[in-house]
């Protein structure tokens, strides 16, 4: 029996989806570009706003603003569309993603900022690349021209780009989000 997802009063959710058995879901940059294209289309079709994103090898993180039912539809379009692309490209069949996506409500500005930083620092934490040099996250969108994210609401929480940089660089490993300690409390269905 599926446990109902927790609702967010603010309609903001940290969303995570991982490859089945932690398998890679991005084999190359072409896969990442296709994922972002499908993501952009899914966001437009469901009128969902994206605040942050990061693509890792075997999973991805999104921070989305929309009612939960629209997020579920967005993720259905995104994960289903990308799985069809991936399976066709690599001649495979079956599920690409492990279970349904995970989601966690984000209720206040403090936790919103924590989740954004957590998402952007994922490549550094995994020792893949420095977060400020990693091409497959929204970190740079807050320092330059936005491409996928609606940054106005979040940008207003910082005095400017220098403040935003300092917020990320002043990080100490105390943030707990969906994937870390809070996962036990997050709905897994």
Give the label of every model feature segment.
Residues 1-52, 56, 65-189:
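Short Pro-Cys-Gly-centered "Cys-loop" motif that presents a nucleophilic cysteine in a tight turn
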